[in-house]
Each structure stands twice: as structure tokens, then as C-alpha cells.
Amino acid sequence: MLEVGTIWGFTSTTMASIMFLWPMYKQFVPYQLREYLENTIQKYLDKLFRRDSNFVYIRFPEYTGEGLSKSRAYDEIGNYLSSISTARAKRLKAKESENSKSLVLCLDDDEAVVVVFQGVNVVWSSTVVDKEDKHNSKEGRYLTLTFENHHRDIITNTYIDHVLREGKEIALKNRERKLYTNNDSSSYSSWWEGLWSNVPFNHHASFETLGMDLDKKEEIKKDLIKFTKGKDYYRKVAKPWKRGYLLFGPPGTGKSTMISAIANFLEYDVYDLELTTVKDNAELKKLMLDTKGKSIVVIEDIDCSLELTEHRKKKKEEDEDKEEKKEAENLKRVSGNNESNVTLSGLLNAIDGLWSACSDEKIIIFTTNFVDNLDPALIRRGRMDYHIEMSYCRFEAFKVLAKNYLENESHDLYGEIGRLLEEVDVSPADVAENLMPKSDEDDADICFRRLVKSLEEEKKKKIEKEARKNKKKAEDNVKQEKQNKVKGMVTK
């Protein structure tokens, strides 16, 4: 009878060889033949390894909870394996990292690596279920830990904790913040392609460079810091550890820049949720569940994303009075599956219902140009806890922009610019455009004079607009007086 050590050495060599040949095997061998061979090999392996219960297998799937959420353990184990695979694995997968000068190498799919922990040999293998295997499609990717049964205590009580701890430390060291966007539900046919796509988050906005009143910026920063330290407090008051921010104001006032500044200040990932591509309420719930903690979920221009406004509520009442609700639903069915069926109640439940407590330390931000158009239920305190008005550019915000764009903190034109900014409404984006040098010859003086000229033109337009408005009002008054006289004569 073979000794356990002999079997173990044979197993390690065999698994490494199989993982090396596996991609070619899947590519060139027909599926029906593969299925037969795999069943035969499985029977052999069962007899070889499981007959005396010498080996234990622990599987760590990529997704947990019936595929609803990403497994943290899977990610942490992946980080751990990436640190040891470079020198040991035959096949590696290369990934770019913004925080590293070189490529990050990790264990490739369908590959195995042998690890020694306190004198104990274990095998880690990475597996991807064949997409043609419909019965196991929910397995997706998974990592398997194999070890001898008599080492069960040290593996389950010590080694796994060691792996997860190492994985967390590596993640913090090499953390690269991401900007996510949800995939169009009509563009992917299989769940393993993922609900979210991501790119590195490289926006460099900060509160220091944000064109806004200094006191207001400090107030927002203090609120954010208080939130990040509020884990115990939120648990004490029995509330999910999340906070909602509503950014509202005219176009160009810096709402998107504010989001980037918040993300950089907290070092959070950003999930840009495009509601119009979400199929229905169930898919919206899955998207929210698939977001991680220490993140910001953003819905920009929410008044334009879906019909979630007060106008929709009034229209619905009119439709019910005219008994047109059924007809509208029929038309919706005919329009096909590409139209989003997300409802206001579905959105409210996703951000503030029972499922919202499934992940901690999360900020939800809505932006809108027209806050009065939004349904009051959507922006009430408790959902959108902090309302931040992004207003037109005034003198304090101008000074921040002048320092950022021109490295200038004083000029003879500051007084005139401050006076004009109080008289006209211009966005920080418009001011920044005038302050930005257009050529190498443009110095601070040229840029400030260009801004003054632009502000004077805006003031002229404002005066002309008010004059036209007053003229029309006077004409309307004269017209109304004539109508009243005629009406009085007819009455007599």
C-alpha cells in the first residue's frame, strides 16, 4: 500500500501538470469527449484520494449567497496567492496596477500551486467552470484548498486565518481605487461577465482645489470625517452605516467635481449607477448588493434618469382619473425588454430598505439641476441626510480658482471682479474657463482682464433681459387696462 507521503508527492506533481495542460485540453478536445474523460478521471481520483479519507478539500467560491454578492474571502485569498505565485506557479496572470511600478502577477485560471505552512504541504488550485456546463454555471470561479486529513486542525484553526489576514494586508498595501459603471443588462448573456465594469479612478479633484466657500467646505469635510468614525454610533442607534448626500444646483457648479473630491478625501471607490440601463427593481437590488463597503454610489442627474419626479405623481393621478393606467402598462409591455422598469418604490427600497443594511460604510449621492422637480420621498432626511447647494461662483470661490489656475492670490482687478460676481450669476466652470491660459503668452493679468470682459458681457445681457421683461410687463398692464375699460363699458 502506498505511503501517504508518496501519494502526496504524486498528487502535487499530477495537479500541477494537469493545470498546465488544461487550457489546451479545453480548446481542442470536443465537449462530449471531455465530459466522458472527466467522468472517468473523477472516478479514478475518488478511488485514489477519498478511499481512506486522506485528503480534505475546501472550496471558496467567488460569489456567495446564491451569487448575489462577491465573497470577501475569495478576494483576500487571491491577494495572498498573488504574493506567492510569482516564484512557484507555472502559469500566471498579469494585471496592471496604478500604485505599482511593475505588473502584478497572480495565479492564472485552472492553475495550481503548492504552499508549505509550518512544515505542512497544501495545494491551492484556481478553477473556472466551463460555460458550456449549464448545470454548474452558478459555480463560476472558485479556489480550492487541498490538504491531508491529519492536518485538519492546523489548517482550519491557524492557516486559513493566516491567509485571510495576509490577504487583507496586501490589499491595503496595493489598493487601487476604482470607478465602476453598471453593465447594460441587455448586453451580457451570462452572469459571470459581471454586473459592474471598472477602470482605475484617477480624478485628482480635492477640497483644496474646489471652487467653493471655505467655511462650507470645512463643514462638509467635518461631516464626512464624523461618518467614517461612526461605526459604533450607527450600530448603537440601530441604523445602517450609510449616509446620503444630495448635490443640487445649476449646471457647471461643480457637482461632479465635488463627488471626486469626496472620493479622494475618503479614499473610497465610486460606483456610477446609470438607472436607465437597469432592467427592473430586482436587478437594481442585485447591483446594490454587489457594491463593496468604503464606496460611494452615485446617481447623477436623477431627475433625468427616470420618471422619478413630482410631475410623474401628478400625471399618474390624471391617468387613473381617465382610466388610462391599463393602457399605459400594455404599451410598456409592447415596447420590449430594453426599457427600464425601475420604479420609485424600487429605488427607495434599494437605497433605504432592508437590503441596504447588507454592507457597511457606504455613501449614496444624488445630483440634480432641479431639486424642486424631485419626489419629496426621494430626498427626505434619512435618505438624503445632507443637502448641499452648489451655487454660482462668488468672490470666495473665485479666489480659490485663481490660486489653482494662476497661482495668484492678489491683483488690482480683484475688487472689480468681486463686485461683478455679486451682480451676475456665473458658474465656477465658466470662471475657470476664463482663468485658464490659452497660450504661453497668457499671464495672470491677461486672464483676469478676459474674465472681467466676460462678466461685463453677462451683466449687459442681464440688464437687457430685465429691460425686455419690464417692457413686456408694462405692455401687458396697458393691454389689461384696455380690456378692463372695454369690459366696464359693456357692463354699463
UniProtKB/Swiss-Prot annotation:
It comes from the Eukaryota. It is a single-pass membrane protein. Its main location: membrane. It is found in: Membrane. GO terms for biological process: response to stress. Pfam families: AAA (PF00004), AAA_assoc (PF14363). It catalyses: ATP + H2O = ADP + phosphate + H(+). Its EC number is 3.6.1.-. It is an enzyme of class 3 (hydrolase). Keywords: ATP-binding, Hydrolase, Magnesium, Membrane, Nucleotide-binding, Transmembrane, Transmembrane helix. GO terms for molecular function: ATP binding; ATP hydrolysis activity. ATP binds at residues 249-256. The chain crosses the membrane at residues 7-25. GO terms for cellular component: membrane; mitochondrion; plasmodesma. Residues 323-332, 462-484 have a biased composition (Basic and acidic residues). Residues 313-334, 462-492 are annotated as: Disordered. InterPro entries: AAA+_ATPase, AAA_N_dom, ATPase_AAA_core, Mitochondrial_chaperone_BCS1, P-loop_NTPase. Its cofactor is Mg(2+). Belongs to the AAA ATPase family. BCS1 subfamily. This is AAA-ATPase At3g28520. It comes from Arabidopsis thaliana (Mouse-ear cress).
